[in-house]
């Protein structure tokens, strides 16, 4: 109990030390990452659900691309937020030099690759075989984009890149599977049990 109180106190103190730029960055990144994972996860789950539970196609063909659009917008906002965070002023949003500095950082490389991946996911709105292949490639690029920033920049870089990419693909699949499975369960569809078992097998 004592340790829990100490941890909570440390969290509260750390929260109080955050400035407004950090708070907005945390909020924007949380929303950007969540919509990104939902978009990619929906596209990945569409690959197997179209055979196991065809009823989910009508849901995922709109849900995934819609999340992708929001993800593109939210990820785009990270560049001006990063520029403002660096100098501690909102005026950096209109400063071409600071925006360029933020764009040329590892964050910019990551967002560029992620944006391309999200654009490819948009083709899942018409889930034909070729388009599903393209959207799957987009999911791979999205997962890879997270390896272009943060601790994966250290050595052994390519091993870390491979590990984080595989980890993100698994996370995308898990997150993207919850919405269609919940939708099937709510409708009490006959394919719910089969879909849940198939989801579990693929996840393992």
Where are these regions (language model features)?
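Polytopic transmembrane helical bundles with strong interfacial aromatic enrichment
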Residues: 1-204
